[in-house]
Amino acid sequence: MVLLLNCIVAVDQNMGIGKNGYLPWPLLTNDFKYFQRMTTSSVKNKQNLVIMGKNTWFSIPEKNRPLKDRINLVLSKKLKEIPHGAHFLARSLNDALKLIEQPEFVNKVDMVWIIGGSSVYKDAMNYSSHLKLFVTRIMQSFETDTFFPEIDLKKYKPLIEYPGVPSNTQEEKGIRYKFEVYEKNY
């Protein structure tokens, strides 16, 4: 099975994605709806798989775990048991991708979405696979302590248009942002 990986992330002007385990900007409702739509839209009788690190999992409010209508897989080298509410646990992205190649997953999983954090994004971007990056580019700086890896434009081609991705600049709560899509081919 040829694996199509997607990363979805919101970044500020300095590629910051988090502060103390949380988003450093106020909730942007349209970006949140975009995240939900992109990560839940799947073909009939299948669900998308969301892969996240342990810290990302625990940053999701407990009442919202697991992310509904998606198969939730948590990555951790330290956890011995699947966190309450998660569906699967793997030690690495590589282990997770091997797991979903098993026959019982092939018929259940449509798309794979990497949703954080920083080290999981880095692993995905270095993985030898076709990859799309869905980036919400916030057009200002925030105080951050966690960053998304630099996007190497020699490897990643920006897509001018992509179905279902608004191309116009958005604004909420005085914060301007735009949706971008990049594609890496292997």
UniProtKB/Swiss-Prot annotation:
Pathway: Cofactor biosynthesis; tetrahydrofolate biosynthesis; 5,6,7,8-tetrahydrofolate from 7,8-dihydrofolate: step 1/1. Its EC number is 1.5.1.3. Keywords: NADP, One-carbon metabolism, Oxidoreductase. Key enzyme in folate metabolism. Catalyzes an essential reaction for de novo glycine and purine synthesis, and for DNA precursor synthesis. Residues 4-184 form the DHFR domain. This is Viral dihydrofolate reductase. The lineage of its organism: Viruses, Duplodnaviria, Heunggongvirae, Peploviricota, Herviviricetes. It catalyses: (6S)-5,6,7,8-tetrahydrofolate + NADP(+) = 7,8-dihydrofolate + NADPH + H(+). It comes from the Viruses. Coiled coil: none annotated. One of its GO terms (molecular function) is dihydrofolate reductase activity. The keyword Oxidoreductase applies. NADP(+) binds at residues 10, 16-22, 54-56, 76-78, 116-123.
